[in-house]
Amino acid sequence: LSLHDALPIWYDAILFPAVAGLRNAAEDELLRKLVNTPLYYVTPMPPSVMGVRVAMLLMENFKSNGGIELVSNKINGGVIENNAVQYLTSDHLPDEKLKANNYILATGSFMSQGLKSDYEHVFEPILNLDVHASTNRDEWIEEAVFEAQPYMHYGVATDKAFHPLKNGKVVTNMYAVGSVLEGHNHIKQADGTGVSLLTALQVAKEILK
């Protein structure tokens, strides 16, 4: 008995959790062929197969174009001179200066340590870029727990082209994308992924100009 024969004839479509096709599209194609019924995937809770699949394809494309992934490594600092990043340093390659024509800051917000704070201020930990945040700690939060919290809007200050600022001056060869940016509450608005994708696409266009 085939899957198609086992289905009631009045089914117009099948809604299926998005769990097929992690490595390639063959699983999806086979499943569609077996049921012979319009098949639509429903996105489950993250991390979803679709999201992981997209991430894998992007990384494969990155590597095929000469990109290098430093697995489990972490950028810990760098040098800015003449309003441009000269190089970055990392935990596992302490003697190497990582140099590029352009740099993209996609470190996220507080949860991923793209932003940090102490008892006095909020700061960007890698290059100490300018951060838009209140200097009064009492203004970081609201008493109402479920309201939008002021600290959720804090982030790295940039110009219109997403170049971050350092001491009020534009860092010309660096861009910031995603939830590290100021003025966007991705937690309350639940649109962090969309903003990350759109700002990344815009920055890619800026670099390719």
How does the language model describe each region?
Residues 2-7:
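Short, small-residue-biased leader/transition segments that mark boundaries at the very start
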Residues 16-26, 40-60, 70, 188:
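Short beta-strand to alpha-helix junction loop
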Residues 113-119, 172-174, 179-209:
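A conserved FAD-binding loop/helix module that cradles the flavin
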Residues 94-95, 131-136, 140-186:
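FAD-binding beta-loop-beta segment adjacent to the flavin cofactor pocket
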Residues 117-140, 197-202:
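Gly/Ser/Thr-rich active-site loops/lids in small-molecule metabolic enzymes
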Residues 65-75:
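A conserved beta-strand/loop element that lines the FAD pocket in flavoprotein oxidoreductases
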